[in-house]
């Protein structure tokens, strides 16, 4: 499969945020079979026109001129499944003005300037289907809307946010296009489109443009706005398993799953990580006390108050010792193998500068390791390396650090990098050099080496070497502290041998451990730590989903929505309902305002009491926001709505409506069902888009399409005379009499024919596995309640 901007599915797995592979969806079928291809026609919006030799003169023959800027009329963030794809996108309405008459091959020098600024565009395959495909389109002639799409995607990629989906479509208004790009963050996506417009106009008008500064701004925004790498790798793994997620704040608090089935993570902490356990892990003395009580070796040591106290502790413990901050990170402020009073005193100052208490403990000889324990199992292990610089007879040690150490692409200040920049003025580094008789200004003779960092360089994966005894001891330590996920720092000579036999010891047990060292080791394989955490939270085939029913009609579908919710609620499930009549939780109405939008739906899915949910939607909300859920168990389409009131969204023709409404069926899970009104031919035609089963309903039991469906052993809900009938193939079961007093009373109270609403609701409940007897009882109870006179 290929994404429209040219990257293959395998290439588009994001390095630090959610995956774009959509492997649990049939999104690529949607893209390929719908209008979504840069050279395809038809569908909701027509594709950009092709360029013929008669239309586009050779660029060399065209005079250079200055064009007015492309105008971005508005941008919308479609947060849920939409007419374009299953994932969040930015949709921009773009007016290219007079450039409608000037394709790319009619703009002198444009191709050369654009490709020089963004050489990565060669990776975009576009509709050509191979590397360099977009550049072929660019050279042969394509329009600025299409170019804007690819440039925005490339800017996001250069900023560290790889995404693989983009579209540019004409709206029907001359020179006005819908430009759509996949993004993981609204602010980043919008800035990418605005920056792409500025860059494209600079290339068209032969003006200078600072590409590096633009990418730097976007990179900074990605770092500030997007999920951190540890959280993101868990979300990626969950997404690959079909587990939905909702970001709950601007940081790294993420909900995995929906409603009562949800779990929550915050970086590498989960809702099973207790505050008590985290508090214990922060108290290093208490942690060592508890771990030692369980029989796991730890170094002797204590917290100290001053440099003098540190030396007294060192004398009591016995030299050599380690001095470190109690709450250090990335081994900042840690000094090892200290043997003299002067060294201990200097090390205390370096540790105290980190802003926490200072610990002195016995030095354990060996190599430092970090082991990740998840759910009582060691799932990853890395070994540290000592960092040296090698002299050339000319450069100072400070210069050698910059040229030999800080050039490592894994080092830097960005959150997604596993190692920090090494600074020559760091107090621990100064002490380390002093102990070697050196300073940052010392010049090493050619071939001589100096140690510049002893701790914090977890770079070598050793997961496959961990001895079972060590794995057992690490799991025990995590359990004693009370952490479901723990990063354990271990010093041992050989991780492939039993712990106690070689005098190794646990030096720290950490809550919320960083995962980058396991994702980006310098040597060895990256470990699937995100997958391990996802499995820990959702064992087996768990997806964290609650039953969701999505429904769309012609604006009169609230009754069916309320019927479905009542059937589920009366089955004993706490059911949320967001529909045109308002927002409901069980029998309680939370709001009387229309709740068709994204936010009311998401509000219900965040609620931990919700065991099932029913969401009514409309074409406008699909176009303007997207659905509030990624997939549903049941998708119901009652009627094909018309285009009235959608002109501002460039929908003016009834022929455009099926492509909008199909979104509701596109998101049906493979184990779910589409419930379709067989009496509406346009609705019936949506059956092909369902990944799951199709259940038809009809007030005409002799309808030919229903008969053909039943001949294929399909299920249908029918109104036959006085009966509502459940049919599976040739088998039929009478469910309830429509002549029952509660039905007739309800019919007199409500306008129109209530039968389609009842049939749709019965079909949805049946699709969810509600037994017929319970459907019957719940249906009669609902009608009884609705038909009862109001009490004032």
Model regions and ranges:
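Walker A (P-loop) phosphate-binding motif
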Residues: 541-582
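Residue-level signal for inorganic ion chemistry
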Residues: 238, 489, 578, 616, ...
